[in-house]
Amino acid sequence: LPRHTLHCVAYHGYCFHSKV
């Protein structure tokens, strides 16, 4: 898995990059 994964939060309605 890539370190930078794009997480889309449906219940918040936005996407953010997480360094996991």
Swiss-Prot record:
Protein purpose: Has bactericidal activity.
Coiled-coil stretches noted in the UniProt entry, renumbered to this chain: none
GO cellular component terms, A-Z: extracellular region
Family the UniProt entry places it in: Belongs to the beta-defensin family.
Cell compartments where the protein resides: Secreted
Protein name: Beta-defensin
GO BP field: defense response to bacterium
Alphabetized UniProt keyword annotations: Antibiotic, Antimicrobial, Defensin, Disulfide bond, Secreted
Organism of provenance: Dromaius novaehollandiae
